[in-house]
Swiss-Prot record:
UniProt xrefs under SUPFAM superfamilies: Adenine nucleotide alpha hydrolases-like, Class I glutamine amidotransferase-like, GMP synthetase C-terminal dimerisation domain
Domain called Glutamine amidotransferase type-1: residue spans: 9-207
Subunit structure: Homodimer.
Organism: Coxiella burnetii (strain CbuK_Q154) (Coxiella burnetii (strain Q154))
Name of the protein this chain belongs to: GMP synthase [glutamine-hydrolyzing]
PANTHER family per the UniProt record, alphabetical: GMP SYNTHASE [GLUTAMINE-HYDROLYZING], GMP SYNTHASE-RELATED
Length: 524
């Protein structure tokens, strides 16, 4: 019997927290579907979503200022359990009649939480026990405000040395507040606390499992497309691979795979992709030579957003042309949830576009093909779990992500054939050395970036002006936040030496040591 994987659902309202997407991932790990929406979303959307519980995220602002963000007032009147985290707790307390003040001593980092009332959220959870027999928890704090007076109906359920009201609860209305962050790994029992809220308080049934997601996706694809054919664009990445595999599992030979050789793929990538997909999918793969087409469309374009949109439009036009030849009506795409989040804007304009993904905001409005996006609700780690469950090879599943527009957005400014050739060689050297040194799977994504600037160097006995290559490697779980990878200096020196000596046009190599945020993973 097929499960309704969306029947039980949690809504997360985002107040601008760097951890908001992490909350969503934790809820998904518990086995319950959730969605992340901006805190200023309209009432109708929330009511249509019909959540079993609502989580208010943290945020960078202070509740004590009149113009700061507030939770929609009606959510406290609909009988739905609410959990406020950090800023979410503070705004809930303030909006329901409590008081919030700036603290004399901000709390950042580890703190020991003393549980005063373990009912519901903290039931059976402890890291240690105090001499008085009270449960103690190691938690992660990051706040400059505190709830100084509880709202009517609430009681303090936990405290720290610096926060007398570190957790609060109105058990009758099922409203809970946590001043700490249960979603981060620095709060070891955080997963269990969130599970208590989602499973026991909100009474959600954990149907969001890999097996059920696959079943639901197959059923959805079959219902949408019927007997019609679907065309799926292959890129060599995990997203398009899992998309193609799901579609093939759903409709068999109705799937047609298309690999567009844009000229912007990595060195030897076309041959590698064709080999992998024909071997493991057994599907028909059409390779379209579109190098001249993409280069012509990108000529003179230096703006990153324009490059992304042009790439998106050219991809769609190629697929439409192939679809007409084959009488195909559907396009399958590997859009994933972070693509949707990063490309979204709130209706009030408070959200900001970080970048447009070529398969989300970069699609032309007059597109003739109908879209099917089976991964649209999934984070990257969920996509990889699906791929393994579907039997795809681990080397493909854990291959580093590659952007749809390809090397066009790893070349700063205008794209031309010379720059592409230089970047392909530099990137291949970097990846080759990562694999030889067993660092490839220790980082989540690594690549080279071409900078169209010339820097002076010395080759032989002569001065030499050459281009600059930047190397980027990051570690991340969900690609929503990332840390730069602290690779050994000896390794970076070896890569730099090879690039400068093997690519005559390059005179300098630099390494990017910026986290996300403030930077994005890609340079453009």
């Amino acid at each position: 019997m097929l499960k309704d994987i969306h029947q039980h659902r949690i809504l997360i309202l985002d107040f601008g927290s760097q951890y908001a997407q992490l909350i969503a991932r934790r809820v998904r790990e518990i086995g319950v579907y959730c969605e992340l929406m901006p805190c200023d979303i309209d009432e109708e959307t929330i009511r249509d979503f019909n959540p079993h519980g609502i989580i208010l995220s943290g945020g960078p602002e202070t509740v004590t200022l009149s113009h700061t963000l507030r939770a929609p007032a009606f959510i406290f009147e609909i009988g739905c359990p609410v959990l406020g985290i950090c800023y979410g707790m503070q705004t809930m307390a303030y909006q329901l009649g409590g008081k919030v003040n700036r603290t004399a001593k901000a709390e950042f980092g580890h703190a020991q939480l003393r549980v005063l009332n373990p009912a519901f959220l903290f039931d059976g959870i402890e890291d240690q026990v105090s001499p008085q027999g009270e449960p103690l928890l190691d938690v992660w704090m990051s706040h400059g405000d505190i709830v100084s007076e509880l709202p009517p109906g609430f009681e303090a359920t936990a405290c720290t040395d610096n926060s007398p009201l570190a957790a609060m609860a109105d058990f009758k209305r099922r409203f809970f507040g946590l001043q700490f962050h249960p979603e981060v790994t620095h709060t070891p029992q955080g997963h269990r606390i969130l599970a208590h809220f989602v499973i026991h308080i909100c009474q959600c049934i954990p149907n969001w499992t890999t097996k059920h997601i696959i079943e639901d996706s197959i059923r959805d694809i079959q219902e949408k497309v019927g007997k019609e054919q679907v065309i799926v664009g292959l890129s060599g990445g995990v997203d398009s691979a899992v998309t193609a595999t799901l579609v093939r599992k759903a409709i068999g030979d109705q799937l047609v795979c298309v690999l567009v050789d844009t000229g912007l793929l990595r060195l030897n990538e076309v041959d590698e992709v064709l080999n992998v997909f024909q071997k493991h999918l057994g599907a028909k793969v059409i390779c379209v030579d579109a190098k001249d087409r993409f280069m012509k469309a990108l000529k003179g374009i230096s703006d990153p957003e324009e490059k992304r949109k042009i790439a998106g439009e050219q991809f769609i036009r190629v697929f439409e042309e192939q679809a007409k030849k084959l009488n195909v009506k559907w396009l399958g795409q590997g859009t994933i949830y972070p693509d949707v989040i990063e490309s979204a804007k709130t209706k009030t304009g408070k959200g900001h576009i970080i970048k447009t993904h070529h398969n989300v905001g970069g699609l032309p409005l007059n597109m003739e093909l109908k879209l099917i996006e089976p991964l649209r609700e999934l984070f990257k780690d969920e996509v990889r779990k699906l791929g393994l469950e579907l039997g795809l090879p681990a080397d493909l599943i854990y291959r580093h992500p590659f952007p749809g527009p390809g090397l066009a957005i790893r070349i700063l400014g205008e794209v031309n054939a010379e720059y592409i050739n230089i970047l392909k060689q530099a990137d291949a050297i970097f990846i080759e050395e990562l694999k030889k040194s067993d660092y490839y799977h220790q980082v989540s994504q690594a690549f080279a970036v071409f900078m169209p600037l010339k820097s002076v160097g010395v080759k032989g006995d002569a001065r030499h002006y050459g281009y600059i290559i930047a190397l980027r490697a990051v570690k991340t779980v969900d690609f929503m936040t990332a840390q730069w990878a602290d690779l050994p200096h000896e390794f970076l020196s070896k890569v730099s030496h090879r690039i400068v000596n093997e690519i005559k046009e390059v005179s300098r190599v630099v390494y990017d040591m910026t986290n996300k945020p403030p930077a994005t993973i890609e340079w453009e």
